[in-house]
């Protein structure tokens, strides 16, 4: 937060400090050279988890202040309007789309482009993007590869959950699936009679194994694996991490089964306090030369979203490791995958990330949002006027830092639906 003071109509809002975006947050985790010992139900001394449990309680106490506002449509709407007003990147998507000839510019697009620009991956020319529709990650990678890396081509495969009901629409808002069916690994429910039918649900062990097989059959090597899955938890944000455990395990396992040696991985997560999540991070630390917990600047600071990044995969699964992990997904329980007492140095680094991202940044912005709600409930236009000059400065800075260039028409992805202007 920066010390800017505002005056309006003779009144002073000296507490109203523009929410200056933090820098890209990146916390490195140590590589684990000792052997990986997976367990079906590992036990962990409670003392190891105490500070993570305290962190969860502290964050949930702040989130709980918003719970009553979610119960009434009018107050819920006002709250989201206020949170939108203090989002320093609101409006950036449309600018990027029209200034740089970009496609499918969603929030996911901004985050992926920022990750690619910041993390300095060795190769992103062949990618498997999971939990992907409507396609923001693929589009950002395509834009980055052609404007920054100048690869002669970008090869990709992707998957997303295909709705089980014919009445539910596939989230193919831009026609990326419709126009590129050969790039997609999941199948319509109309093909259920097929022996190898796969609807893209990564909480099903057989689907995970099959998706990895399909990906490697169609694309080898795979230099980059991404997964942006998340279950809509409604208003129950206090259980967001817990409710997504199985999904996040499945999307991670799909990546570890398909990513080539030397490849890179980007996985969406939320808070990092549950013993199972911590154990999954410990597993990652055996496979990548570099491992990070990140929070892109363009990821809204009021949410718990984090991205785990692995660089330069060092080895593949052993048959035993693959068997144990697939079995755990099939018969899922949320006990740790490993003995966490063997990873205390790594857990210290994870906790530093929790402190930095959630206990400091997120709580600060949530408190700021609630104060704005109380003071600007019926003055949202005024709040927007105060913040507009700073938003422009921050957005212009983001565009410069992330080295955006115009995408040539010949490199654009094939989309069947007209590209609609981003809602921002």
Swiss-Prot record:
GO terms for biological process: 7-methylguanosine mRNA capping; methylation. Its EC number is 2.1.1.-. Its main location: virion. One of its GO terms (molecular function) is mRNA (nucleoside-2'-O-)-methyltransferase activity. Keywords: Early protein, Methyltransferase, S-adenosyl-L-methionine, Transferase, Virion. Coiled coil: none annotated. Pfam families: FtsJ. It is an enzyme of class 2 (transferase). It is found in: Virion. S-adenosyl-L-methionine binds at residues 135, 228. This is Probable methyltransferase EP424R. It comes from African swine fever virus (isolate Tick/Malawi/Lil 20-1/1983) (ASFV).
């Amino acid at each position: 937060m920066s010390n800017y003071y505002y005056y309006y109509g003779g009144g002073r809002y000296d507490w109203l400090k523009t929410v200056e975006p933090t820098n890209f947050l990146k916390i490195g985790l140590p590589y684990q050279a000792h052997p990986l010992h997976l367990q079906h139900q590992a036990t962990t001394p409670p003392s190891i988890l105490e500070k993570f449990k305290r962190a969860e309680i502290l964050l949930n106490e702040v989130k709980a202040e918003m719970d009553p506002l979610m119960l009434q449509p009018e107050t819920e709407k006002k709250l989201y309007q206020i949170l939108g007003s203090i989002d320093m990147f609101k409006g950036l998507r449309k600018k990027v789309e029209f200034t740089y000839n970009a496609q499918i510019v969603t929030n996911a697009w901004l985050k992926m482009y920022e990750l690619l620009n910041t993390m300095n991956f060795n190769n992103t020319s062949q990618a498997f993007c999971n939990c992907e529709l409507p396609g923001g990650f693929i589009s950002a990678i395509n834009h980055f590869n052609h404007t920054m890396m100048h690869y002669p081509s970008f090869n990709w495969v992707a998957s997303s959950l295909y709705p089980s009901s014919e009445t539910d629409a596939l989230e193919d808002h831009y026609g990326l699936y419709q126009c590129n069916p050969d790039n997609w690994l999941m199948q319509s429910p109309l093909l259920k009679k097929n022996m190898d039918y796969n609807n893209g649900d990564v909480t099903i062990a057989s689907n995970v194994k099959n998706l990895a097989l399909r990906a490697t059959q169609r694309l080898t090597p795979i230099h980059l694996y991404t997964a942006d899955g998340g279950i809509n938890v409604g208003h129950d944000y206090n259980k967001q991490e817990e409710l997504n455990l199985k999904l996040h395990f499945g999307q991670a396992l799909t990546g570890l089964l398909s990513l080539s040696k030397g490849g890179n991985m980007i996985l969406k997560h939320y808070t990092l306090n549950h013993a199972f999540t911590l154990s999954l991070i410990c597993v990652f630390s055996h496979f990548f030369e570099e491992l990070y917990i990140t929070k892109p600047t363009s990821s809204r600071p009021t949410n718990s979203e984090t991205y785990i990044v692995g660089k330069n995969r060092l080895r593949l699964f052993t048959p035993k490791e693959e068997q144990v992990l697939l079995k755990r997904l099939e018969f899922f329980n949320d006990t740790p995958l490993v003995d966490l007492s063997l990873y205390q140095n790594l857990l210290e680094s994870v906790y530093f990330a929790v402190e930095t991202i959630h206990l400091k940044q997120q709580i600060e912005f949530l408190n700021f949002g609630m104060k704005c709600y109380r003071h600007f409930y019926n003055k949202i236009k005024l709040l927007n006027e105060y913040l507009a000059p700073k938003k422009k400065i921050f957005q212009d800075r983001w565009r410069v830092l992330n080295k955006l260039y115009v995408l040539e028409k010949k490199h654009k992805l094939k989309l069947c639906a007209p590209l609609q202007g981003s809602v921002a």
